Amino acid sequence: MDDTGPRQLTWRWRVLAAIIILAVRVLRWRIEVQGLEHVPARGGAVLAFNHHSYVDFMMVGWPIVRQRRRPMRFLAKREIWSSRKVGWVVRWAGAIPVDRGSDSAREAAFEAATQALQAGDLVAVAPEQTISPSFELLPLRTGAARMAQQAGVPIVPVAGWGSQRALTKGGTKRLIRKLPVTVRFGDAVHVGPDDDVVEVTEELTRRMTRLLHEVQDTYPDGAPPGARWVPARLGGGAPDHAEVLREHTERERGWTRSDPRSADSEDPGRPDGAAGPA
């Protein structure tokens, strides 16, 4: 691992940061950042965040760029590169494209992310791989643990809450003003060269779940009964998590049967914890 110093912000990252800061100020979003001290000031680290909105990576990157003065790379679906609206964002940010329909392409993305970590970059991944309709954690894949192990860097668990009220899959897609958003970074998970990545992922799941419950329980706007953006566990109107898990498992199995090349798709070891629209 190269820990000689943090990568510098390029002019493109500075422009992106300025745009994000302007948007947050115009919308008057109230972003509360907690536990940023857990993010290394130098050297590589995997930032594993929960995926519940289309702007998760921005909420994670906001404090990294603004307060840590470090750029952040992230994994995203290759389809985003062809988007007229946001394609330029992922290109400028140096994001790593993931083609989930090809084993070789997924491995190439995994290697690119590992090399970035070894070079001292921060790499953000969404181990759930897709947005969770229940706003509870879906099963995590082991890609984050594998990357961290191969690169010799820690995993920093991250939980965000609030942005799903504005921009999420199958829900509201409008920019709400004065929206409170909480982003909490937790204690790093360290991965030894001989550690079992499945066990590491189980520990990561426990930590991310704990962080998520903490930010949900302390959210400034509470948990209004029946609200679409509130988990059923808290009395909200989001889909039941058990049903979401069942449908998620069936969808994964169906995808595996339809694409024999992806026989490992039921194995959470696939290195494709892509962020971005799912």
Predicted regions and their residues:
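Generic preference for hydrophobic
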Residues: 33, 47, 74-75, 183-185
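Catalytic core of membrane glycerolipid acyltransferases/transacylases, capturing the structured
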Residues: 40-102
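Glycine-rich, highly charged phosphate/nucleotide-binding loops
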Residues: 29-32, 105-110
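Short, flexible loop segments at the rims of nucleotide/cofactor-binding pockets, characterized by
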Residues: 22-28, 100-103, 133-134
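Short, basic, glycine/proline-bearing loop/turn elements
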Residues: 20-21, 92-100, 127-131
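Short acidic-hydrophobic, aromatic-tinged amphipathic segments that line or gate anion-handling sites
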Residues: 33, 96-99, 191
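Helix-to-loop junction immediately C-terminal to a conserved catalytic motif
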Residues: 12-13, 20-51
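Non-catalytic C-terminal accessory region of glycerolipid acyltransferases
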Residues: 2-8, 107-278
